[in-house]
Each structure stands twice: as structure tokens, then as C-alpha cells.
């Protein structure tokens, strides 16, 4: 729980709308994950890539899923007036915790329980508690102390980047994001046709 509190405190220093933007990404990561597992959205490119992540555990599937998750945030930045620093901070938090802590280091069984039952442990943990999607074999509140290095290092990186940001980056960010989304859509199409 301490890591979540620390995340929200840090988000307050990312700008006047930092907290609300981080709250948005916190809630949307849960809702987005639920949507990715819903049959109604089975053929969306992001759902195809996410299913691939569940079925095949390889460096390629991790890489594609990381790109997919980061590109989803670029769509939100184009459509909603959110704080880009909070969005970047939230994205880095999600990706580093999901892939480094859970998938590579296997800090606990929280994420593995989600792979056993895709309707449980959608994450973040506190949201699973609120919506009743906690896996019955996981503690009511996850010990989040393993997230503290991620929280601190991601915050330092975002604050450093914010200090050296120039407005011309936005144009390049849009170009790169567009190419990334095109790449992911093409990859999803290829994976769908192979399965």
C-alpha cells in the first residue's frame, strides 16, 4: 500500500493536473485490462497482442506487449487533456512493475494468478479490492514494498526528462507514436493470421 501512496504523492509534483491525470491512468489501466479480456473486443489489435502475451512467453511477446501498452497511452494523450508527465510516469510504473517485478523477477504470485484466471488480479491491486476481482488465493492487500525502487527510479527519470524537455519534442513524439501504433496494428494482424 505504501508504494501506491508514494505514487500519488509524486504525481502531485508533476503539474497542477498531475494527480487527476495519474488517477485516470490508474483507473484506466484496470478498465483497459478488463476490456482486453472481454469477448466483445476479441478482434481489436490490442486484444490480439494481449492474448499473444498470455499464450506465448518469449522476449518477443514481452517486447510487443510493452510497446502495445505504451502506445495505448499515446492515444489517451491525443484524445484527452491529461498531464503528459503523469501519463509517462504511470506508463513507466505499469510497464516496469508488470515486466520487471512480476514477469522477470517473479516477486510474488499476484500476476501468475491472473494468468491462471484472466478475470482476476487485473491490477492495480487496490482497484481489484474495490471491484472484487482479487484472486481468492492472493492476500487481501498485496505487499507493495517491492514497487518502491520502481516508484523512485521512474520518478527521477520523469523529473529529469521534464527538466530538459523542449516543445519540439512533442512533434517527434507524435511521429514516433503514430509509427508505433502502425507497427503494433501490423503485428497484431500478422499474429492473428498465424493463429
Q: What are these language model-derived features?
A:
Residues 1-11, 16-45:
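Early transmembrane hairpin module of multi-pass membrane proteins
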Amino acid at each position: 500500500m505504501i508504494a501506491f501512496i508514494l505514487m500519488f504523492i509524486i504525481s502531485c509534483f508533476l503539474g497542477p493536473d498531475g494527480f487527476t491525470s495519474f488517477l485516470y491512468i490508474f483507473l484506466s489501466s484496470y478498465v483497459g485490462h478488463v476490456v482486453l479480456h472481454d469477448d466483445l473486443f476479441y478482434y481489436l489489435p490490442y486484444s490480439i497482442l494481449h492474448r499473444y502475451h498470455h499464450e506465448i512467453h518469449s522476449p518477443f511477446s514481452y517486447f510487443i506487449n510493452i510497446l502495445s501498452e505504451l502506445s495505448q497511452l499515446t492515444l489517451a494523450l491525443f484524445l484527452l487533456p491529461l498531464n503528459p508527465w503523469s501519463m509517462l510516469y504511470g506508463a513507466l510504473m505499469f510497464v516496469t512493475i508488470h515486466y520487471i517485478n512480476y514477469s522477470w523477477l517473479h516477486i510474488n504470485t499476484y500476476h501468475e494468478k491472473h494468468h491462471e484466471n484472466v478475470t482476476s488480479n487485473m491490477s492495480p491491486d487496490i482497484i481489484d479490492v474495490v471491484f472484487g476481482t482479487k484472486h481468492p488465493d492472493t492476500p487481501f492487500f498485496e505487499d507493495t514494498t517491492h514497487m518502491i525502487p520502481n516508484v523512485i527510479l521512474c520518478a527521477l527519470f520523469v523529473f529529469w526528462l521534464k527538466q530538459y524537455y523542449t516543445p519540439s519534442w512533442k512533434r517527434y513524439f507524435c511521429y514516433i507514436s503514430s509509427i508505433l501504433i502502425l507497427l503494433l496494428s501490423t503485428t497484431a494482424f500478422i499474429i492473428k493470421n498465424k493463429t
